[in-house]
């Protein structure tokens, strides 16, 4: 073979090789990212909706855009119960829900519906992020779920359309929407309310049509869900502290590579801090907003809170067996230690 021809052949082969390498690089770049469906019931502009968007951003960043979270807020994928079932079946990947519907699967989660469990957010954080909180999360895999961590739903407060509630007796006869679990039902029935379990996604319409008189939720939820439009009375009762459980589908999570699992776990941890801070600021902002929109605000006095505690004491004692005596006493002891009592 002549030298000139040989050079042409070498150049041609080199070009083909480079072209092949280029094609491989393009192919790698063009691989579709893993899409992760994340459904939730709250509004997208709520503090927790914003935290969900933050989670999506962190996942994209940590995975170098190889994992993409697609959020579906405002109950677009259904109520909490449906979201939980979608994770169990494998048709969804990520969600956050209140502990109340989880208690239908794992009764011990009902401990968070007991009244006046935590004095403040600091105590709640210590218990949830400590051994007692982990014990509960460790029960989830057996049900097809992974508990990544706890976010904050917050202290719940009562609104209604009938009259001011500032005393225990004022609760009597109020048709009050409660979360769908036995603990919430038992507590509010014990306080004299006509407690009606109902999915959150149906709540605004029920309030608007007077199917129910009132409801109980954290302040930022009351604002962002626009309950104040049909609920002129607010009571700062802080009667229950409710966490959100940040959940993943176990079937899906188990199929991830270790690197992908690390991304989800780290993004959940980062977003927990973001969410709690946003939620707490959101509650402060919400109270100011609600007052500016002519919502009449009342509070229980120390004496009235003590009456409520006394009223529900036998109910709580009776619920210990249903929830799990060991869980209730463990959480109460952890809360007492965290509060320095």
Task: Kindly give the residue locations of the regions a language model identified.
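Bacterial N-terminal signal peptides
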Residues: 12-21
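Sec/Tat signal peptide C-region and signal peptidase I cleavage site
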Residues: 21-28
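Bacterial N-terminal signal peptides that target proteins for export
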Residues: 2-13
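N-terminal secretory/targeting leader peptides
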Residues: 14, 28-123, 131-133, 140-341
């Amino acid at each position: 073979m002549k030298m000139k021809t040989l050079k042409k052949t070498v150049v041609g082969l080199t070009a083909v090789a480079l072209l092949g390498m280029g094609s491989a690089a393009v192919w790698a770049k063009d691989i579709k990212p893993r899409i992760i469906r994340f459904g939730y019931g709250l509004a997208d502009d709520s503090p927790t909706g914003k935290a969900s968007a933050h989670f999506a951003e962190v996942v994209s960043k940590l995975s170098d855009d190889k994992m993409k979270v697609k959020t579906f807020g405002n109950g677009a994928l259904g109520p909490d119960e449906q979201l939980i079932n979608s994770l169990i079946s494998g048709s969804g990947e990520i969600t956050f829900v209140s502990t109340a519907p989880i208690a239908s699967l794992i009764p011990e989660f009902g401990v968070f519906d007991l009244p006046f469990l935590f004095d403040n957010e600091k105590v709640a954080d210590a218990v949830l992020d400590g051994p007692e909180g982990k014990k509960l999360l460790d029960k989830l895999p057996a049900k097809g779920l992974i508990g990544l961590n706890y976010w904050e739903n917050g202290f719940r407060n009562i609104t209604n359309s009938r009259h001011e509630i500032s005393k225990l007796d004022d609760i009597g006869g109020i048709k009050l929407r409660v979360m769908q679990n036995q603990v919430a039902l038992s507590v509010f029935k014990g306080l004299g309310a006509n407690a009606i379990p109902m999915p959150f996604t149906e709540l605004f319409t029920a309030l608007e049509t007077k199917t129910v008189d009132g409801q109980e939720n954290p302040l930022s939820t009351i604002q962002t869900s626009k309950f104040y439009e049909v609920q002129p009375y607010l009571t700062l009762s802080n009667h229950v502290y409710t966490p959100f459980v940040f959940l993943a589908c176990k079937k899906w999570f188990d199929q991830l590579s270790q690197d992908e699992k690390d991304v989800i776990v780290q993004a959940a941890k980062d977003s927990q801090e973001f969410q709690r801070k946003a939620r707490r600021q959101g509650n402060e902002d919400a109270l100011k907003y609600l007052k500016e929109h002519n919502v009449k605000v009342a509070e229980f006095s120390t004496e009235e809170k003590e009456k409520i505690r006394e009223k529900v004491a036998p109910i709580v004692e009776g619920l210990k067996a249903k929830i799990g005596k060991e869980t209730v006493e463990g959480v109460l002891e952890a809360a007492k230690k965290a509060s320095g009592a």
